[in-house]
């Protein structure tokens, strides 16, 4: 299903050159595809090693120690996956958003720690942004209601206020207070409910007044019940307050929040880095000195320093740390044999790692690649749906046998309750073909094939391929609707499902090319042009321009946009008078 491209020329005022927006594209002779490849390999290795299908959760360690990761590190692992979805414009990993949601839904949404709930709230709002599914936002608001109960004015010290870190009321920590400000500001921007903003500002104001050094701008880690402030130094604390400041700046437009974020970032890059041959790298301690929760800390710190840098790309001192950290991760902290990363981003490498340190590395590599340059594409045809990017229910990921497509396949499923959902987006209603690429090395297998919740093929046989590294195709015909459809492959012993089956991909045939029509062109503010066009939910689109003569390379206006409904829009900020030709293409 190839995309029909639409382009037009528009005279706009005020074209800002790309170099001013993204200086590293102009001064660094590095192919963006290299960074995207590194980010992809890191995230794919992370998923292959840590996703535990029969638990619908993440393992704690590699090699596995038999335990599962914790609540808050699962939230960051989920965010790392969504970084991959965003970076690739929805071409990869999209179905896994729901897989991770299902895993936490089965485990329960509340925690004994308010800071952990803040991170899960942020992850839920991110899932809503990428999918448009309000169930994620509804769960975020329900969870935030629990967070607000942690506010207390009876303890601690001379100026009493702030959120408890935990429900046992042992301390008040930056993790909970900056986290609540950050999450509340995000909820306000998505719901318009001023109660979220008011609470976020209340928490932020208290913490800024009482727990930030007014001279150095270091953030205090926590305050115990006696009122004693504990000034542990971690990138995490500064990163969270940077994130809260940026979110509140976006929610209110007040420059004071941006100024605070820059002050705090100055402390971070001045005191929480270590020198390497690539430049200063974010640092919370050595592989042995940074233990426990510390393994996760640099991930969110990097995320929010990057968010701040995106607000003002003249802050090259931030970019120096961001790029050096990404380069050192790949060159100094990567175990090239197993594709895992050490706690210390400056190395040395480690053989045994945990999920937290690995997802922190994935966060940094994916955020940097997205900011550095455009995604070159997955190379996967639009009508080919990779099983490893689908929504998984109690099935495992694997990348061992034969010439599989994409970055893996699903495996180890032969029990009731196991299934995979492909989210298929069509341009036409009517007959389509579904071709499943699979391996059945243990003999003949069978599965239920359901379409939009109806068992279209209750006991479809998959003939033996004779070996796990030999693949075959099983094709059926069915009717699909215009827009999103769900094609499920299910193990149900009552309907005759049997034996093991590795599922590689689904190719959908019989669809027509998509015709994109620009539906409106507007100027929402001086110097900003907005294009709107029709979409199919779940597909991704790339808006590009080139110069007035209609020659030269096409330049991406924004990263690929994942449609969350029947229409989408993109803004192009311009400076001096210029004529531009625009088009919307398949990324």
Model-derived features: positions:
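Extended ligand-binding groove/face enriched in aromatic
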Residues: 94-190, 197-201
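Active-site cradle of extracellular carbohydrate-active enzymes
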Residues: 180, 184-188, 195-248
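Extracytoplasmic
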Residues: 377-512
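Short, composition-biased motifs enriched in small/polar/acidic residues
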Residues: 512-587
């Amino acid at each position: 299903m190839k995309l029909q491209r639409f382009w037009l020329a528009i005279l706009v005022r005020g074209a800002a050159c790309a170099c001013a927006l993204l200086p590293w594209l102009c001064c660094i002779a590095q192919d963006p595809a290299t960074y995207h490849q590194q980010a992809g390999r890191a995230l794919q290795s992370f998923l292959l090693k840590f996703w535990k299908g029969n638990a619908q959760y993440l393992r704690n360690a590699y090699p596995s120690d038999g335990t599962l990761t914790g609540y808050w590190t699962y939230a960051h692992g989920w965010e790392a996956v969504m970084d991959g979805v965003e970076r690739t414009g929805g071409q990869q990993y999209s179905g896994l958003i729901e897989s991770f949601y299902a895993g936490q839904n089965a485990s329960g949404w509340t925690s004994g720690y308010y800071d952990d709930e803040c991170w899960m709230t942020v992850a839920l709002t991110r899932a809503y942004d990428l999918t448009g599914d309000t169930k994620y936002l509804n769960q975020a608001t329900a969870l935030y209601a629990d967070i607000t109960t942690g506010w207390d004015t009876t303890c601690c010290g001379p100026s009493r206020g702030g959120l408890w870190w935990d429900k046992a009321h042992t301390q008040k920590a930056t993790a909970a207070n900056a986290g609540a400000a950050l999450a509340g500001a995000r909820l306000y921007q998505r719901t318009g409910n001023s109660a979220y903003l008011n609470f976020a500002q209340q928490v932020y104001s208290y913490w800024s007044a009482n727990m930030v050094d007014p001279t150095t701008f270091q953030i205090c880690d926590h305050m115990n019940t006696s009122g004693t402030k504990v000034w542990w130094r971690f990138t995490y604390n500064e990163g969270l307050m940077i994130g809260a400041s940026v979110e509140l700046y976006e929610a209110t437009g007040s420059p004071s929040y941006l100024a605070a974020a820059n002050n705090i970032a100055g402390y971070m890059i001045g005191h929480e880095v270590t020198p390497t041959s690539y430049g200063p790298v974010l640092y919370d301690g050595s592989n042995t000195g940074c233990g426990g929760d510390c393994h996760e800390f640099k991930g969110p710190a990097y995320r929010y320093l990057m968010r701040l840098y995106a607000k003002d790309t003249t802050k090259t001192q931030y970019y120096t740390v961001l790029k050096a950290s990404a380069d050192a991760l790949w060159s100094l902290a990567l175990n090239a044999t197993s594709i895992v990363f050490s706690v210390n981003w400056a190395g040395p490498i480690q053989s045994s790692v945990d999920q937290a340190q690995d997802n922190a590395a994935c966060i940094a590599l994916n955020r940097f690649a997205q900011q550095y340059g455009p995604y070159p594409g997955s190379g996967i045809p639009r009508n080919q749906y990779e099983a490893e990017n689908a929504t998984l229910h109690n099935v495992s990921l694997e990348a061992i046998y034969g010439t599989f497509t994409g970055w893996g396949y699903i495996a180890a499923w032969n029990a009731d309750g196991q299934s995979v959902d492909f989210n298929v987006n069509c341009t036409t209603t009517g007959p389509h073909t579904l071709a499943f690429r699979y391996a059945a090395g243990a003999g003949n297998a069978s599965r239920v094939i359901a379409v939009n919740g109806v068992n279209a093929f209750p006991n479809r046989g998959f003939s033996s391929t004779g070996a796990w590294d030999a693949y075959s195709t099983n094709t059926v015909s069915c009717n699909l609707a215009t827009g999103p459809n769900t094609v499920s492959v299910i193990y149900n012993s009552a309907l005759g499902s049997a034996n093991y089956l590795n599922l590689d991909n689904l190719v959908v045939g019989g669809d027509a090319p998509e015709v994109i029509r620009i539906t409106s062109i507007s100027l929402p503010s001086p110097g900003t042009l907005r294009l709107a066009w029709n979409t199919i939910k779940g597909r991704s689109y790339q808006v590009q321009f080139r110069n007035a003569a209609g020659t030269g390379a096409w330049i991406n206006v924004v990263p690929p946009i994942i449609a969350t409904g029947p229409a989408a829009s993109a803004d192009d900020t311009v400076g001096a008078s210029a004529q531009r030709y625009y088009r919307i293409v398949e990324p």
